[in-house]
């Protein structure tokens, strides 16, 4: 029997990274088809043959006007909807058509975002060791993770994790998972992709399901990708954008029916009650205290905010609950205005917007000149993801990080 002289503790030490996980690059993508919110009520009621529902259309018009959204992007063009009329009826069986569409398009949009992130990262794809792919729709085998790995030409040894049907909180989830992977696997480079196409949920209006109309006033399509890794290789010009300091998830008791989605023959149905913003805003103070108490941070206006903009009421009530200055939510409100709610991808768009606004405004760090920041994801459960971030200096030596 041969006795090894290597101790398990030493093996474990060699397996782990030395430093904290960081976001090294961010990329985003949207479908080409852009819809403006001012035009959408007329368009939506026309393509769904619902113009006779004048009172309902007026209500939808008011929803769109109060959404704080200027425009959104969607894979569904009028031509596609004309070819799939069952998708325009509230209760018509249409799952096969929706599934075929989403299974094909989600990886394509994810690939586009991933290519942008990889371009900014500036390293060969052979260095990607892990792939985390997240989408709300299009469950299939092999999954979207496999398809995008194949499209990108990632190494066949890449370690994949596929996350389906998590919903809007999952933009935080993927960062939490990527942090664990990067810090526990020396040299790991994790490609994270969130790709969301809401074709599963599009349908005509119903006078008895007004919360479905709320979703139609908010949701858009988009994909975001990030590269996460520890111990940036400065010799290869790897540069962090944000360090991922800590990550936690919590379920809000008694809220399991607050945001509900069900996959049916008619597609994905969802329930969005009016008290969701109140549930979320009531939870934020406790989440902040738990996350920042160990760091000695107590002033919530002294940190930068990267918040999933599920809708204007969520941002408004969170802002009011913790007495935030209006400027703290600017990145989230900008993304809501220009893209709508893109489920899991949205908060990564906000992270991208944060570093760009910080550079455009001449701040010293990627977090509006502040050191500490928080990223929040909210979604079904109700589930709250809380990520503590640390910004990095913006310097002339790192021009690529702001492109």
UniProtKB/Swiss-Prot annotation:
It comes from the Eukaryota. The keyword Acyltransferase applies. Keywords: Acyltransferase, Flavonoid biosynthesis, Transferase. The keyword ATP-binding does not apply. GO terms for molecular function: acyltransferase activity, transferring groups other than amino-acyl groups; naringenin-chalcone synthase activity. Pathway: Secondary metabolite biosynthesis; flavonoid biosynthesis. This is Chalcone synthase 2. Belongs to the thiolase-like superfamily. Chalcone/stilbene synthases family. Homodimer. PROSITE patterns: CHALCONE_SYNTH. The active site is at residue 168. It is an enzyme of class 2 (transferase). Substrate binds at residues 220-221. The primary product of this enzyme is 4,2',4',6'-tetrahydroxychalcone (also termed naringenin-chalcone or chalcone) which can under specific conditions spontaneously isomerize into naringenin. Pfam families: Chal_sti_synt_C, Chal_sti_synt_N. GO terms for biological process: flavonoid biosynthetic process; polyketide biosynthetic process. InterPro entries: Chalcone/stilbene_synt_C (IPR012328), Chalcone/stilbene_synt_N (IPR001099), Chalcone/stilbene_synthase_AS (IPR018088), Polyketide_synthase_type-III (IPR011141), Thiolase-like (IPR016039). CDD domains: CHS_like (cd00831). SUPFAM superfamilies: Thiolase-like. CoA binds at residues 59-66, 313. Its EC number is 2.3.1.74. It catalyses: (E)-4-coumaroyl-CoA + 3 malonyl-CoA + 3 H(+) = 2',4,4',6'-tetrahydroxychalcone + 3 CO2 + 4 CoA.
